[in-house]
């Protein structure tokens, strides 16, 4: 007698439970193909997440710079070496924060290493972001910024780089930056996300 009942197949007097090896292989192969098809989408979502995080952090820096500039104007502090900003002393250069790790740490409310600077050739770990400042085209840890040329090569203009956990600054283009162009009394900020 042939009969089917909730996964039980009766063949003669022998009862078989479960799936055959062929059925399991087909299901696993199908799942593997679905996973492979979804992988590029998941990787792109990961890249977009880091790019959005950098854009957001860079925008926060822009807002902090506007508040800092307003504080400098109110205090008439253009030529001062330090400006008191939200319970912190921020070292300045030509009226704007210098491009140092300490100055950016004082401006941003993001998880950065407590002091010093990060190694650019080792993946960032221990905080959400890593940072290195006071770089210029002739410095040891300088990383060229795509589509940006330093006007002054002598070291007057300086840059600070901030990159996310898990990335290296030296090898991956996934960071945001702030340039104090003291040679022209201006600043530049932006983000690079090609390597995220």
How should these model regions be labeled?
Residues 2, 13-49, 53:
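N-terminal single-pass transmembrane signal-anchor helix
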Residues 11, 68-69, 87:
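Alpha-helix boundary/capping detector
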Residues 49-76:
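Membrane-proximal N-terminal amphipathic helix
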Residues 80-83:
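Extended amphipathic alpha-helical segments with heptad-repeat/coiled-coil character used for oligomerization
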Residues 86-196:
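Intrinsically disordered, low-complexity regions enriched in Pro/Ser/Thr/Gly and acidic residues
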């Amino acid at each position: 007698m042939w009969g089917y009942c909730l996964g039980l197949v009766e063949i003669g007097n022998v009862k078989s439970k479960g799936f055959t090896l062929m059925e399991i292989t087909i299901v696993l192969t199908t799942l593997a193909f679905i996973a492979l098809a979804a992988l590029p989408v998941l990787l792109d979502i990961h890249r977009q997440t880091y790019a959005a995080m950098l854009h957001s952090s860079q925008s926060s820096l822009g807002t902090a710079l506007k508040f800092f500039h307003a504080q400098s104007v109110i205090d008439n502090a253009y030529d001062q070496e330090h400006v008191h900003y939200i319970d912190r002393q921020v070292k300045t250069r030509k009226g704007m924060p210098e491009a140092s790790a300490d100055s950016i740490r004082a401006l941003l409310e993001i998880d950065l290493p407590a002091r010093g600077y990060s190694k650019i050739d080792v993946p960032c770990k221990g905080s959400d972001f890593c940072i290195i400042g006071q770089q210029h085209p002739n410095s040891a840890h300088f990383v060229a910024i795509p589509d940006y040329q330093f006007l002054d090569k002598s070291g007057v203009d300086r840059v600070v780089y901030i990159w996310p956990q898990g990335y290296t600054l030296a090898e991956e283009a996934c960071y945001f930056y702030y340039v104090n162009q003291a040679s022209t009394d201006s600043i530049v900020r932006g983000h690079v996300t090609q390597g995220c």
